[in-house]
Amino acid sequence: MTSKLSPNRSSSNLREDSVSTLPNQTLIAPELLAPAGSLRNMRYAFAYGADAVYAGQPRYSLRVRNNEFSLESLAIGIEEAHALGKKFYVVSNIAPHNSKLGTYLKDISPVIAMKPDALIMSDPGLIMMVRDAFPEMPIHLSVQANAVNYATVKFWQKQGIERVILSRELSLEEIETIREHVPDMELEVFVHGALCMAYSGRCLLSGYMNKRDPNQGTCTNACRWSYDVKAGEENETGDIVLTSEINKAVTAPQVVIPTLGEGTPSPKVFMLEEKEKPGELMPAFEDEHGTYIMNSKDLRAVQHVGRLTQMGVHSLKIEGRTKSHYYCARTAQVYRKAIDDAVAGKPFDSTLMGSLETLAHRGYTEGFLRRHAHHAYQNYEYGHSVSDKQQFVGEVIDRCEESGYAIINVKNKFCVGDSLELMTPSGNITFTLNEMLDKRNHSITDAKGSGHQVRIPIPSDVSLNFALLLRNLDEGVDTRNPFRKAPSAVTPENASEA
């Protein structure tokens, strides 16, 4: 999809949360690009508004441990995407060692024969090999190539690259400068998902600690683990060692200045011990916040969709090939509305920020799009994803012909009396659950948890294709119950797009 703004536009004085177009200027929607770790994720992403998805073969992409795609499923995914008028990109962005070069063309040839819309690549050697063997194959430059300036983008344009996925470490102003200097190159920008504290994911922590190389797709997310902290000191040779009981009282503390110039200097040196690996110690420094040493918050840039659209960015990308189909559906739904509103010239809908709060996350940040103090990037509270707004509790698999009730595959426990949200591609309904039946149509009060199946009443005129069920955790959630009215009474009051 090509997305450009008509000439002579400047957005330097426009707010990030609004869209304003001048006469004779037409905004074209950027592509909404969603992650696909599985065929199911792909299908939900498309149902909720994604224009394209990206997926990879495990051996050659950076998602080896959580990737359900094989040659057979890639073929199915590409065929289904094209049947819907959507696009499917195949990721091939590892930093390959010599051992993988000999088999690469043999392994990628059947994938290219499936006619994906592009390969996402980062290594110049692999790019050269594909260019020589398959000169007509479109190539997008992966974020792993660290394109952070317009000269780099121009270089790759001369190599025949059709699109550059810009590094996450860029500000809005830097992205706009690149757009102005290379107006005829397609640009792609990450707008949502996990961030890495290393430069665009080029990290060795997992490889150092677990012999799992992140640059070969086997990252174990060691940066997000929980660590015990023990007192340390610098010895006479400059090594960091455990502080002994004998010299603890006389050892001078090591004052550590925060690298970003914010916060209180730390008076201590520590040794970190991962709880699952007792006895293996790693030196580190700590300030007043805690010991999550490289645990980034998650990127959320929905409030900047308007400005990125004005710049003429071609594709807005969501990270998350290891996430659930619910994650793919919710993020696609929210960013679809943000893009459509931007193109229509509507102001930013701040409720979209709240919709993304319902996803499990590690805290949100704007990343580098705007500059912040260091605590705005780092998560000091937890190493896993959580949400205190909503919980994904089930997926709708069918409608019972006899009762008209929705048949739910339960993922997490919920009960009669709970505030629920039915999420569908056409809109969302919030209600209080008044009744629940088991598979034998016996009345029950709670769905026990994953592996169970229950039936609940749903208005008959609501399409249940790709519908998901969420439990609201906020006590203040407004629960207008559609079941107190006739089944057809799904009104703007109780059905709204997220």
What do these predicted regions represent?
Residues T2-R9, N13-A47, A52-R59, I78, ...:
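Surface-exposed amphipathic alpha-helical tracts and adjacent flexible/coil segments at the periphery
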Residues F134:
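Conserved phosphotransfer cores of two-component systems
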